[in-house]
Amino acid sequence: MIFKEEGSMKLVKRIGLILLSIIALLVVFLVGSVVVDRLLDRGRIDALVNTWIENPNGPAVGAFVAQPSGDGPHPAVIMIHEFWGMKPSVNGKAAALAEEGYVVVAPDTYRSQVTSWIPRAIYLAMTTETAQVNTDLDAVFNWLATQPNVDPNRIMVMGFCYGGGKSLEYSLYNERVAATGIFYGSLITDPAQLQALPGPVLGIFGATDQSIPVAEVQSFEQALNSAGVTNQITIYPGQGHAFVESIEGIRAGGAQGEAWQEFLTFLSEKL
């Protein structure tokens, strides 16, 4: 009996060592993957931005700028990326919006970091400080306001996923923002905070989005109403998170096309 107990303990220790070794290998793999992914960032960003905007309180802000035809002055939209960082899909939507008569700036709020790897995307979204984002967006907003073809009183901020939440935060920070667009972004449901919003709000959400439940969206709408903020909140049936993926998907119709058309209508009426 004593020998059996000793054998069992040895087996437990052996299993423990194997598990620790596996965990150690996973940690090494994750760290190595992040390092390799980070080394590729600069080339990715250079391929996605076409303008560097001076920032008096930090490094220059890389951005994709899309211009409409005509002299203007045009309304303008600051379009903030998802938690991946800058992506061709965001540039495609920015270019399509410019065709509708808007000057569009899609800034890189991660300061030259971008990824297609979910763990790193989550890390970037969680560790990029709101104060830093607001500083960079200030540089973009002020640059837009001085452009000869932009109406400085008609500058909107909007975004997708991470960018939707940052749009809401920035609108609470900058009283000059004319309107706010949130495509399935993080929400604030305190009416006292939302009273500071300087303009109308559009919210686009999916009914099956597990990260932003319908109940939270409804609480957000109620809080906006209590705060006296003009708003248009729509929950699309059968749609999950990040369902407005690309301009190709938008042009194909369905929920993506409907949500985009709702956005365009909101712009034409409110901006």
Residue positions per predicted region:
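N-terminal Sec-pathway targeting helices
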Residues: 4-25
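Serine-hydrolase catalytic machinery in alpha/beta-hydrolase-like enzymes
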Residues: 14, 43-45, 50-149, 245-247
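Alpha/beta-hydrolase
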Residues: 80, 107, 183, 236-239
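Short alpha-helix in the alpha/beta-hydrolase fold that links the catalytic acid
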Residues: 93, 213-223
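Primarily recognizes the serine-hydrolase "nucleophile elbow" in alpha/beta-hydrolase
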Residues: 139-196
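Short beta-strand/loop motif that positions the catalytic acidic residue
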Residues: 197, 203-205
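Acidic catalytic loop of the alpha/beta-hydrolase fold
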Residues: 208-212
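C-terminal catalytic histidine-bearing segment of alpha/beta-hydrolase fold enzymes
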Residues: 227-271
